[in-house]
Design a protein with these regions (language model features):
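Surface-exposed amphipathic alpha-helical segments in non-transmembrane regions
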Residues: 16, 23-32, 63-80, 95-179, ...
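Hydrophobic, glycine/alanine-rich multi-pass transmembrane helices and their short helix-loop junctions
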Residues: 344-349, 368-383, 432-484, 544, ...
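Juxtamembrane "pre-transmembrane" interface segments
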Residues: 152, 172-176, 184, 255-257, ...
């Protein structure tokens, strides 16, 4: 072991090359790593959705849900499943057994569901997908004084423009009703023209199609023939010929029917700060960068706002990268502070060159860990950043111990290279043992099962990678850089105030060691059994305080949030008016609570508020129905208000009472 340490310590050029490669590799890895708020992973669930327009829950239960349950019986890899029958929709959520291949189970479920031939004729094609933890990056609100159709058209336009931006592929619109063309024909009209409703439906169906007509090949080119006949507006549908009478007169759909070009009857309504609104939610895929998406959306908004009518407002209601940016900023700030503290304290007690190279352990360790994460295909997210912040104060410990040991051997008058080798060899095994115990302590986190295990799986990787690189750097690179320390006995004392401060600090430390620490250590060794009993008693006391509840314990503490959401869900079939009344009540209750916590300048702690009836938050995945409603508030940053978000929630529950 000592020969290996000596070989590295003697080869300064090689150490410098490795150092540069680690720093450059870490920097490049950081630039290529994707950034996201939380890691994406499979939750081992499969979703089955079958739309059945116009059906009530009983019809959905009989025609859709029971057929799904029959199809799922006997499929290997399924732990359990739950089914739901709602208006216009039947669905099932399948839990996959832990350890089973989700892709294989998904294929089996798809083939079984697609093989069902007894679904109602009016039912749409089943949609079978794997459920993933999809994260929204940004949510925009479009509001203003305009008709519902104008709002919908403009929102659709903005949605498509955002989807066309670089690095963005998933954009959804919610809070607005879908288009619908209704055709109403009275029985009197049908009798008058001697036609049935089925004939009218068939005429509409057959006359609103895009058909492929084949290919015409010539010597010079190939021409593809396609008949474009699909109708998209009420005016186009009104021109469809339904019947030709004996006199050759053409009876068009507009002659016998009332055609309304409008929206579905779903009672969806949404507001932002009291104005009618539609919402555009931007998601990320596993191949996209959250911060890049958020910045791109912000630039688009800034350019688009000037092109909109004066009374139309496009604003970012929610920025999902705010916490991620804050965590990155915290890591950067803590890194600089740690580097500065290590540099200053080691310079104060030991040597300037030693303080520099020991402090370099922080960027080297983080850079090496970044490269390992990039090589493993991981991302920079809240969990990995938490790991970096947690390990930031540990990675430099071994470098400090090695550096101090080399400094001590050099102060004895040994040649620089021998002092470096003897110094690192003396503390190598204790350092390896100390770092190994920390690594082993984090290894069990890699074996936690379920969703929580997948959620935090990156944490032990970050910590252990950082510790491994730090250990390797302190044993093999640091001695090479400290193998040129000058003879400390021949160093002339400086006369500057900083030199006086350094000598005074060193003298104070030596006095503390000789007069306080050494006598205390001698007493502890002499009366070791008493000190051991005292240590064990202190440990038992600490455990007892936690077990007795005197010291509170929380796995995840309640942090102050800038976002408060209150959701209501009534039994299916509840009228939208009842849901809206409950949502209005929650909104007014929170406005009253917030009014009592205005800032010192009299400013409200609420920046924005959203109200949604007929659809849950989350867009297409959340579900629709008149029994669903939500109200959401964006608060001022925590440093600008004097009340915690949890206290506001408690006050809201008391003010709103039982719904």
């Amino acid at each position: 072991m000592k020969k290996l340490l000596a070989a590295f310590a003697a080869n300064t050029v090689f150490a410098n090359i490795i150092l540069i490669l680690i720093l450059v590799g870490g920097g490049l890895s950081l630039s290529y790593m994707l950034r996201e708020t939380f890691p994406e992973f499979s939750v081992d669930k499969i979703s089955i959705r079958v739309a059945y327009p116009g059906a009530d829950p009983e019809e959905v239960e009989e025609g859709i849900v029971l057929k799904i349950e029959e199809a799922l019986e006997g499929i290997e890899g399924i732990k359990e499943y739950t089914t739901t029958a709602a208006e216009n929709m039947g669905s099932a959520m399948v839990d996959v057994l832990e350890g089973s291949d989700v892709s294989e189970v998904l294929d089996d479920v798809k083939s079984k569901i697609d093989a069902v031939s007894t679904f109602p004729v009016d039912a749409e094609k089943p949609v079978v997908t794997e459920v993933t933890m999809r994260r929204s990056v940004s949510m925009l609100s479009l509001s203003g004084k305009m008709s519902e159709k104008q709002l919908k058209v403009l929102a659709e336009q903005l949605k498509e423009e955002i989807r066309a931006l670089d690095g963005i592929s998933q954009v959804e619109l919610f809070g607005a009703r879908d288009y619908e063309i209704s055709i109403e024909i009275s029985e009197e009209q049908l009798r008058r023209y001697g036609i049935s409703l089925a004939q009218v439906a068939e005429a509409v169906r057959s006359s609103s199609l895009n058909l492929h007509g084949g290919t015409i090949r010539t010597q010079g080119e190939e021409i593809r023939v396609r008949t474009v006949g699909r109708k998209y507006t009420g005016k186009e549908l009104a021109e469809i010929v339904v019947l030709a009478n004996s006199a050759g007169e053409l009876i068009k759909l507009g002659d016998l029917a009332t055609i309304r070009d409008g929206f579905v009857e779903d009672p969806i309504s949404s507001e932002v700060d009291g104005d009618a609104a539609a919402f555009i939610m931007v998601f990320k895929t596993s191949e996209e960068d959250s911060i890049h998406i958020a910045d791109t959306v912000k630039k688009y908004m800034a350019a688009k706002q000037g092109q909109l009518p004066p009374d139309v407002h496009l604003q970012e209601f929610y920025d999902g990268t705010k916490e991620l940016r804050s965590r990155i900023s915290l890591l950067t700030k803590n890194g600089y502070m740690g580097l500065a503290l290590v540099f200053f304290l080691l310079w104060l007690f030991l040597d300037l060159r030693l303080s520099f190279w020991a402090g370099m352990g922080i960027p080297i360790s983080l850079s090496g860990a970044m490269f390992i994460l990039w090589w493993m295909g991981e991302t920079l997210n809240m969990i990995s950043l938490f790991g970096f912040i947690m390990v930031l104060g540990i990675v430099v410990d071994d470098a400090i111990v090695v550096g101090e040991s080399i400094y001590f051997h050099r102060s004895l008058g040994k040649p620089p290279l021998k002092a470096a080798v003897d110094g690192v060899a003396e503390v190598a095994m204790p350092i390896v043992a100390a770092v190994s115990t920390t690594i082993v302590a984090f290894v069990p986190l890699s074996f936690i099962g379920g969703i929580m295990g997948k959620f935090i799986s990156i944490l032990p990787v970050v910590v252990n990678a950082s510790l491994f690189v730090s250990l390797w750097e302190s044993l093999f690179l640091l001695p090479a850089h400290l193998s040129h320390l000058p003879d400390l006995r021949k160093r002339k004392p400086g006369r500057s105030p900083l030199s006086w401060l350094q000598r005074g600090t060193q003298a104070a430390l030596e006095w503390f060691i000789s007069r306080i620490y050494v006598p205390f250590l001698a007493a502890a060794i002499q009366w070791r059994y008493i000190f051991l009993a005292f240590s064990i008693s202190s440990l038992l006391l600490a455990v007892g305080l936690v077990q007795a509840g005197l010291v509170k314990f929380q796995v995840f503490p309640k942090l102050d949030s800038f976002l408060i959401t209150s959701t209501v869900e009534f039994p299916e079939g509840t009228p939208a008016a009842v849901t809206k009344q409950a949502v209005d009540r929650l909104e007014q209750a929170f406005l009253k609570v917030a009014e009592g916590h205005n800032t010192a300048e009299g400013k409200s702690i609420i920046e924005k508020r959203l109200k949604l009836v007929g659809q849950s938050m989350g867009g297409e995945q959340g579900g629709n129905g008149p029994h669903l409603g939500s109200v959401q508030f964006i608060l001022l940053p925590s440093e600008e208000r004097s009340v915690h978000s949890n206290d506001l929630l408690v006050a809201l529950e008391q003010e709103a009472g039982t719904i």
